[in-house]
Amino acid sequence: MADIKNYTLNFGPQHPAAHGVLRLVLELDGEVIQRADPHIGLLHRATEKLAEQKTWIQSVPYMDRLDYVSMMVNEHAYVMAIERLLGLEVPVRAQYIRVMFDEITRLLNHLMWIGSHALDVGAMAVFLYAFREREDMFDMYEAVSGARMHAAYYRPGGVYRDLPDTMPQYRASKVHNERAIKAMNEARSGSLLDFIEDFTNRFPKYVDEYETLLTDNRIWKQRLVDIGVVSPERALQMGFTGPMLRGSGIEWDLRKKQPYEVYDKLDFDVPVGVGGDCYARYLVRVEEMRQSNRIIRQCVEWLRRNPGPVITDNHKVAPPSRVDMKSNMEELIHHFKLFTEGMHVPEGEAYAAVEHPKGEFGIYAISDGANKPYRLKIRAPGFPHLAALDEMAKGHMIADAVTIIGTQDIVFGEIDR
């Protein structure tokens, strides 16, 4: 009699639910997963090595391209590491701007997650709803940096420039008539802060819409409840952070436990899940969207009341203003040196971590006193989560592998680096 062998199946890297370039070798007993072996490296771009050949400031745009769904949060960890090496004080207004854009980025990430996760499982409508809101937030990115995704807006010592007083307007086109254009531009008639405030007033209603579609949906719960269960002890042992750790019932958030910038001055709650399954992680992330909206509102209120500088006045680190350059030879020299040679960072090492939408994103930077990093190590939050896929998927059906990949919120830019 022939032996009954397990069936080996390749999932990805071209699968639409693979979230990029994941190749998963699955060992199946019928439709039940016995082993899941993730093969990574298909998006490896040697970011850490490239950073060693660029000046400190030239590597800021590389950070955007790591987790390309959470652009500015990646930059934040990198510039914080440089600031620790330099011992730099960041102006308070710049800190509030950074925190506000960190939370806008968290919303961008979570909207992409909820849309793609639901689409993978079979709920198509949420994807279209989520991208409607993402469009407004890309406009916020564009208003401050000129780019809709890869902003390169944060700088060692602050941010590139202050918030603009005007918002880009929609123009007449063949697609929209004048009345539609006028309605679309209504929220854009004021400053960027006005536009963000208007968005924060609208956003809770949008989250309610997602919850109406999903939270009590019978099919959604059947696909997520008791799938990919991770106990609090195992979550800690496997190095989980962010919503993956909080979904297992452990209250750990760097914004509360190791506050950076002005998070200790802001009022928000840390949602914690019960059960450690895919549904618990879904509820945690949905509540995180509401809390991020609260933080953004507080930042808008503070920024309205408190004008001030948005970058350090140390011109060995930050470029002087264009006006000063035209009247002062020394400022012109600073500008020239900064953009040709770059700044020299004192010898030492620093680790800076931020509460990234996916977990703890850390930058470990070593300087030998030169104008380039001696070594740059990136701590990607998604890496330990993907390593746990085998344990989370074992014993589940093959269709549940898609749910588990979705709940991990994986992006390969940061995993492969």
UniProtKB/Swiss-Prot annotation:
PROSITE patterns: COMPLEX1_49K. It catalyses: a quinone + NADH + 5 H(+)(in) = a quinol + NAD(+) + 4 H(+)(out). Keywords: Cell inner membrane, Cell membrane, Membrane, NAD, Quinone, Translocase, Transport, Ubiquinone. It is an enzyme of class 7 (translocase). Its main location: membrane. Gene3D superfamilies: Cytochrome-c3 Hydrogenase, chain B. NDH-1 is composed of 14 different subunits. Subunits NuoB, C, D, E, F, and G constitute the peripheral sector of the complex. Its EC number is 7.1.1.-. It is a peripheral membrane protein. NDH-1 shuttles electrons from NADH, via FMN and iron-sulfur (Fe-S) centers, to quinones in the respiratory chain. The immediate electron acceptor for the enzyme in this species is believed to be ubiquinone. Couples the redox reaction to proton translocation (for every two electrons transferred, four hydrogen ions are translocated across the cytoplasmic membrane), and thus conserves the redox energy in a proton gradient. NCBIfam families: NuoD, PRK06075.1. The keyword Calcium does not apply. Belongs to the complex I 49 kDa subunit family. It is found in: Cell inner membrane. One of its GO terms (cellular component) is plasma membrane. It holds the Pfam family Complex1_49kDa. This is NADH-quinone oxidoreductase subunit D. GO terms for molecular function: NAD binding; NADH:ubiquinone reductase (non-electrogenic) activity; quinone binding. HAMAP family: NDH1_NuoD.
